[in-house]
Each structure stands twice: as C-alpha cells, then as structure tokens.
From Swiss-Prot:
SUPFAM superfamilies: Fe,Mn superoxide dismutase (SOD), C-terminal domain, Fe,Mn superoxide dismutase (SOD), N-terminal domain. GO terms for cellular component: cytoplasm. It catalyses: 2 superoxide + 2 H(+) = H2O2 + O2. PROSITE patterns: SOD_MN. It is found in: Cytoplasm. Fe cation binds at H27, H74, D158, H162. Its EC number is 1.15.1.1. It is an enzyme of class 1 (oxidoreductase). This is Superoxide dismutase [Fe]. It comes from Plasmodium falciparum (isolate HB3).
Amino acid sequence: MVITLPKLKYALNALSPHISEETLNFHYNKHHAGYVNKLNTLIKDTPFAEKSLLDIVKESSGAIFNNAAQIWNHTFYWDSMGPDCGGEPHGEIKEKIQEDFGSFNNFKEQFSNILCGHFGSGWGWLALNNNNKLVILQTHDAGNPIKDNTGIPILTCDIWEHAYYIDYRNDRASYVKAWWNLVNWNFANENLKKAMKK
C-alpha cells in the first residue's frame, strides 16, 4: 500500500492573511509531501508496506514512526482549520468546553499558553481522554495522543517553526493568536461526536 499525500480541502491562499499562501505552499507541498516520500522509502519491502497509515503510527517507532505520525498530524492540522472558520465554538463542542473548562475564554487562554510555552517543536492538542473529559495535551516532535494513548484528538495546532516562521518569524504568540481565526469548529464537533460514541 503506497501512502499518498491527502488533498487539501481548500486553496493554498484560503487561510490568508492569517497563514500566507507562501507558508501553506512550503508547509504542504514541501514538508508534508516530504514526510510522505520518506515514509514510502522507509517502509518499502517491510511488513509496514501493507498497513494503513494509522496502523503504522500505532505500531512503529524511530524514523518510520516520525514520518508516519507527521503525515497523520499534518492532515489533522489542515482539517482543524479552514477559511470562514474561527470565532466562538458552537454545538456540542461549545457545551463540552464550557463543562470541562468553565468557559471558552478559559480554554482559549489555557490552550494558547500551552502552545506558546512549549519548548521546541511539537503539537498542541484538544483531546477527549478516557474519562470522557476534554483535555489539553502537548506532544514533542512527531508525538500524538493516538500513539501515547492519552486521548482521542479533537483539534490540533502545529507549533513546529516551519508552521509560522515565514509569516511571523520567531513570534509564535502572534501565530497562535492568528490560528484562532481559522479553527474549524465543525471538524471539532464531528470528532467529538465520534469520540463520545467509543
């Protein structure tokens, strides 16, 4: 089974001005595509060549895991954002955030602090844990909650420097602030609904 680069659900300029076309082009067509190409090279003629991407993420380690997880994480990140998104949450995710964090503003502040305070490269996640509570998680490098079994991902934000350096240089806080204008709450609601059924 050849791993392919998932198609973006919006144009490269669709997230502008918050994330520029130049950033998205490099991030998607160079970084994300690079992980796909590298993984296919690494798994050729191994048992992983017959497995799905998700199974590779769950079962692998080392370079194979790093590339597989980065493919999965990036696809989830693209889907966590969209044009004409952002603003306040709605539907079940709004109610669940209020239940588990007290208010959307509390959640937004806590999540932003985690994203801005994370040392080095990694990811910030909103996830549903084993007690059916929403939690904020941070993972280093290619890590994710699926591999760590710490929760079911609901949303993610990429905090590797390549996600924001063209647009914001070393100002991660401005990138995080801009990211809130792109959050796809419909995607979060879909993930929450599926996660609550498990």
